């Protein structure tokens, strides 16, 4: 990338102005020309929500000021965008070979350089949103013991990929990201498409702990039979 932005937030008692990125203005564009900005606490925490990071740029007209003023309350924001994506899913499937890639990859800090060398060489899709995250010191009981030993780090680097086209005939980037994340001892969000087989899935997630929780909380199997079946989507 030819442009890097580091966003640091700190509390102040007073502000000379307060920016609003829920309507006309667009946060991810503002970072190109603003070195300093003031937002309320809630607006800072949800500063990417209006655009779903920058997904609105993939929808014709949705970054135009007039359309945002007229229909912003119905179209903008992650909840609205998800609602419309579900409504239009049959049409989108006819127009696209596969859905665009929208997922988060959590890479151990000591493996991030390896991951980024691969990313800069192959996908090369930007913007790439990066956020450091701390793992609980006591460990995370839903990660398999062996995979936790592979992670072997208190810090994970969240790499968020939003709106990456995935129409190549011979390469499914969703599947490729999943494989590379596992190769770098990381984790991926499971609200996206999932491709791993059951054996690989439970190399990552702690099957006995999930099974125990399932038996206690859903003893009659009213919901999906197990975590793998709930999250796995071969399509």
Residue ranges of predicted features:
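Noncatalytic alpha-helical scaffold of FAD-dependent oxidoreductases
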Residues: 1-235
